[in-house]
From Swiss-Prot:
Signal peptide: 1-18
Residues bound to heparin: 158-161, 225-232
Residue list for modification Phosphoserine: 143
GO biological processes: acylglycerol homeostasis; cholesterol efflux; cholesterol metabolic process; lipoprotein metabolic process; melanosome organization; phospholipid efflux
Organism, as annotated: Onychomys torridus (Southern grasshopper mouse)
Cellular localization per UniProt: Secreted; Secreted, Extracellular space; Secreted, Extracellular space, Extracellular matrix; Extracellular vesicle
Positions of region (LDL and other lipoprotein receptors binding): 154-164
Modified residues (Methionine sulfoxide): 139
Keywords assigned by UniProt, alphabetized: Chylomicron, Endosome, Extracellular matrix, Glycoprotein, HDL, Heparin-binding, Lipid transport, Lipid-binding, Oxidation, Phosphoprotein, Repeat, Secreted, Signal, Transport, VLDL
Molecular function terms, GO-annotated: cholesterol transfer activity; heparin binding; phosphatidylcholine-sterol O-acyltransferase activator activity; phospholipid binding
PANTHER family referenced in this protein's UniProt entry, alphabetically: APOLIPOPROTEIN (PTHR18976), APOLIPOPROTEIN E (PTHR18976:SF2)
Protein name according to UniProt: Apolipoprotein E
Function in brief: APOE is an apolipoprotein, a protein associating with lipid particles, that mainly functions in lipoprotein-mediated lipid transport between organs via the plasma and interstitial fluids. APOE is a core component of plasma lipoproteins and is involved in their production, conversion and clearance. Apolipoproteins are amphipathic molecules that interact both with lipids of the lipoprotein particle core and the aqueous environment of the plasma.
Length: 316
């Protein structure tokens, strides 16, 4: 029980610090800074720009959110991004050339995982907007301010996750591209080796034997390092996501507490008004009865004056 209270206190302090010093947003307001002109990056940039417009929650956005227009636009942009991404990945696979099978499989697996995370982020965004539309439709004639605030918080969180996963995918594709370039260079080296003189071929074969002995170790070391880095990044991402969830839950709890307090104040005011309405007529009636009684007493005294008492005189 003490441990639970300690965790709650730490969470509250973290929320207070977050309110006192707001977290700085990454510089992503104009364009994605890491874009290098690849078609899939340009398609993702269009998705990002549309998301920035949706996040303003302007009157036009609110109007279009009532229909399926926003989710349809996001679906088209998602499909364009995934199509361009698959085409770019296929192009890199064709350029890989000769490469260790373990390295090829590892790179392909990492890129596929990063691609899946990016697609899941886009899908979560679309689903969240669809959920908001359904919630608004069920609250016709009521205030949707709380729904808009909650949507803004979720969009900010999803946008950060989308940015992080997009950068991770770009980095892994860069490694994939470097592997393709290395494979092409190895292919040219192999042709040069076959066309060289016999002495050069023998010397090259000897050098390749030495390199071949160390290559599996190098590949395994690279694979192990990549797995360790991936695991550390995953743990860090999970910790950040968990912290965001805790903060979001605390914000929701605080909003509910404030709402309940406001309702209690309103109920107290209503009860006070009812009490006043009950007792005011009673007090006024008692005052009227008391005034009538006083008037009657005064009238009775005026009509029947008390005669002066006779005092007997003493005999002299």
């Amino acid at each position: 029980m003490k441990a639970l209270w300690a965790v709650l206190v730490v969470t509250l302090l973290a929320g207070c610090l977050a309110e006192g010093e707001p977290e700085l947003e990454p510089e992503v307001t104009d364009r994605l800074a890491w874009q290098s002109g690849q078609p899939w990056e340009l398609a993702l940039g269009r998705f990002w720009d549309y998301l920035r417009w949706v996040q303003t929650l302007s009157d036009q956005v609110q109007e279009e959110l009532q229909s399926s227009q926003v989710t349809q636009e996001l679906t088209v942009l998602m499909e364009d991004t995934m199509t361009e991404l698959k085409a770019y990945k296929k192009e890199l696979e064709e350029q890989l050339g000769p490469m260790a099978e373990e390295t090829r499989a590892r790179l392909a697996k990492e890129v596929q995982a990063a691609q899946s995370r990016l697609g899941a982020d886009m899908e979560d965004l679309r689903n969240r907007l669809g959920q908001y539309r359904n919630e608004v439709q069920t609250m016709l004639g009521q205030s949707t301010e709380e729904l808009r605030a909650r949507l803004s918080t979720h969009l900010r969180k999803l946008r950060k996750r989308l940015m992080r996963d997009a950068e991770d995918l770009q980095k892994r594709l860069a490694v994939y591209k470097a592997g393709a370039r290395e494979g092409a260079e190895r292919g040219v080296g192999a042709i040069r080796e076959r066309l060289g003189p016999l002495v050069e071929q023998g010397r090259q074969r000897t050098a390749n034997l030495g390199a071949g002995a160390g290559k599996p170790l190098q590949d395994r070391a690279q694979a192990l390092g990549a797995r360790i880095r991936g695991r550390l990044e995953e743990v860090g991402n999970q910790a950040r996501d968990r912290l965001e969830e805790v903060r979001e839950q605390m914000e929701e709890v605080r909003a509910k507490v404030e709402e309940q307090a406001q309702q209690m104040r309103l109920q107290a005011e209503i009860f006070q008004a009812r009490l006043k309405g009950w007792f005011e007529p009673l007090v006024e009636d008692m005052q009227r009865q008391w005034a009538n009684l006083v008037e009657k007493i005064q009238a009775s005294v005026a009509a029947n004056p008390i005669p002066p008492s006779s005092v007997p005189q003493e005999s002299q």
